[in-house]
Amino acid sequence: MEKAFDMNMIGDFVPTLTAYLPVTLYILTLSLLFGFVLGLFLALPRIYNIPIVNQLAKVYISFFRGTPIMVQLFIVFYGIPALTGLIGIDTSKMDPFYAAVATYALSNAAAAAEIIRAGVGSVDKGQTEAAYSIGLSGSQAFRRIVLPQALVQAFPNMGNMVISSLKDTSLAFSIGVMDMSGRGQTLITSSNHSLEVYIALSIVYYAVAVLFEWFFRVAEKRIKKNQTRIVTVFDMNIH
Amino acid sequence: MIEIKNIHKQFGIHHVLKGINLTVRKGEVVTIIGPSGSGKTTFLRCLNLLERPDEGIISIHDKVINCRFPSKKEVHWLRKQTAMVFQQYHLFAHKTVIENVMEGLTIARKMRKQDAYAVAENELRKVGLQDKLNAYPSQLSGGQKQRVGIARALAIHPDVLLFDEPTAALDPELVGEVLEVMLEIVKTGATMIVVTHEMEFARRVSDQVVFMDEGVIVEQGTPEEVFRHTKKDRTRQFLRRVSPEYLFEPKEHIKEPVI
């Protein structure tokens, strides 16, 4: 039974929910870390057009970008025990936290791969040629010359990915993870004040997202300071 | 020292190089001139295998590389003997001037950082940029960028320096400072192959001038032979058109017959 709207409850809920923010951030950090590394390995065959692996990467990316994150969560959550069961390991009692991290990592990898690929594509081919011309090997040219510039190019998109991934983690409660949203669900059950809980949740998520956005904006400015870019009239301060 | 035999290159149906032969002795300056699309840049890029010829042989120091199927090792080896200066500079945008010059030393040649720094600083002094060591490419003028490009190529002490139209992208006012640096390099006795539109430069510093058109070498020889005692009509036509006087010549006389 829903109770009458009570503004004061929001203020009470915010600190209760914020106490679970570390869990949310933990899922986010781990999944971004693993996702980024996996994304790099997915991007490489796409960039270098390596036969077969390229097709597999394409299918992988397309699948994870084309299915809802909640469906992916359940597939991984039920899929891991089913898979490990085949080799006789029982993981059905596994903490759903790990399934959530795995899902978000797999999903972030698909997004990261496309972002990295676009970043590498935006680096002038001449950079690679110049690296070759002074005797760098293919991998040296990629690691030392192309990738650093590609990551700078990709940085704004990475920022967007982090923020959208933060919002995605709010679905982890559906497989029973006790993160901020999970705690929100239990608060609703115990208090019968759904609206207040959701408003409190939105306040915390929004605050974190704004903080991230600010951080990425400042970081981007610092990183781009030394990069070559074409200065247009739009960059000039005309008063 | 360098012998290049029968280089062929095709882009799709477009036959860009139709069997180029060239011998370059140690300390020689070879300039390649010719109209756009004649294949001169492609030929130069074949020499460090940035472009893979369909056929041909490059030998340096008695080491013979079959360009059709070079091994990774051969490609890498060849690139270590050569260095290229690009029309669009291609400085590493995320590295400072000194880091740009050090890169080929510390990474490709495993030189110690302090030693590489000393070499790079010295090369940058030669091109007059000793006070820009810590600047980023985006903070330099075109002429300064190209001088860094030259220092980067010089630093690795290649057997042969390849210049791909090094002044073509520069403001007219900045061409001089780059050519000046190149003249200094000529004086050191470096082996150079230069693709250029700077005819006066070609005329004055070359030991050998090569005129290319439509994928073949039309004419080659000393500057005296090519510029003064031109043998082929196509060369004469090209030289006339690039000469400053061309614009003011009475055009009625040189109209080509319409077939």
Curated annotation (Swiss-Prot), chain A:
KW Lipid biosynthesis (keyword) present: no
Lineage: Bacteria, Bacillati, Bacillota, Bacilli, Bacillales
Name of the protein in its database record: L-cystine transport system permease protein TcyL
Domain ABC transmembrane type-1: 21-216
Molecular-function annotations in GO: transmembrane transporter activity
Pfam families: BPD_transp_1
CDD domains: TM_PBP2 (cd06261)
Inducing stimuli: More strongly expressed in the presence of methionine than in the presence of sulfate.
Transmembrane segment boundaries: 25-45, 69-89, 96-116, 196-216
Membrane topology: Multi-pass membrane protein
Key words of the record: Amino-acid transport, Cell membrane, Membrane, Transmembrane, Transmembrane helix, Transport
From Swiss-Prot, chain B:
Enzyme Commission number(s) from the entry: 7.4.2.-
Signal peptide (UniProt feature, chain positions): none
Induction section of the entry: More strongly expressed in the presence of methionine than in the presence of sulfate.
Alphabetized PANTHER family for the sequence: AMINO ACID IMPORT ATP-BINDING PROTEIN, L-CYSTINE IMPORT ATP-BINDING PROTEIN TCYN
CDD domains in the record: ABC_HisP_GlnQ
Molecular function via GO: ABC-type amino acid transporter activity; ATP binding; ATP hydrolysis activity
Keywords: Amino-acid transport, ATP-binding, Cell membrane, Membrane, Nucleotide-binding, Translocase, Transport
Similarity comment: Belongs to the ABC transporter superfamily. L-cystine importer (TC 3.A.1.3.13) family.
Gene3D superfamilies: P-loop containing nucleotide triphosphate hydrolases
Subunit structure as annotated in this protein's UniProt entry: The complex is composed of two ATP-binding proteins (TcyN), two transmembrane proteins (TcyL and TcyM) and two solute-binding proteins (TcyJ and TcyK).
Location in or out of the cell: Cell membrane
Record protein name field: L-cystine import ATP-binding protein TcyN
Recorded name of the encoding gene: tcyN
Residues holding ATP: 34-41
GO cellular component, one term: plasma membrane
Free-text function comment from the UniProt entry: Part of the ABC transporter complex TcyJKLMN involved in L-cystine import. Responsible for energy coupling to the transport system. Is also involved in cystathionine, djenkolate, and S-methylcysteine transport.
Domain ABC transporter: 2-239
Transmembrane segments: none
